[in-house]
């Protein structure tokens, strides 16, 4: 498996996890979390989105 295939797989896994996090954020379970946990999950989402964008840019330049 070459590096592009690994990046494609990594992005697919990341995007799947990101989709699940976004879905969780629209539930009552998320809104009932302590404020600090909500803050950290929101930051996690932002970083995951940035990471996904970086992987997409790497693939676009390949």
Model-predicted segments: where are they?
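Extended, charge-rich alpha-helical interface modules
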Residues: 1-62
């Amino acid at each position: 498996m070459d590096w592009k295939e690994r990046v494609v797989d990594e992005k697919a896994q990341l995007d799947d996890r990101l989709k699940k996090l976004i879905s969780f954020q629209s539930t009552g379970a998320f809104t009932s979390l302590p404020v600090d946990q909500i803050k950290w999950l929101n930051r996690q989402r932002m970083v995951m989105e940035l990471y996904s964008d970086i992987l997409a840019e790497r693939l676009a330049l390949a």
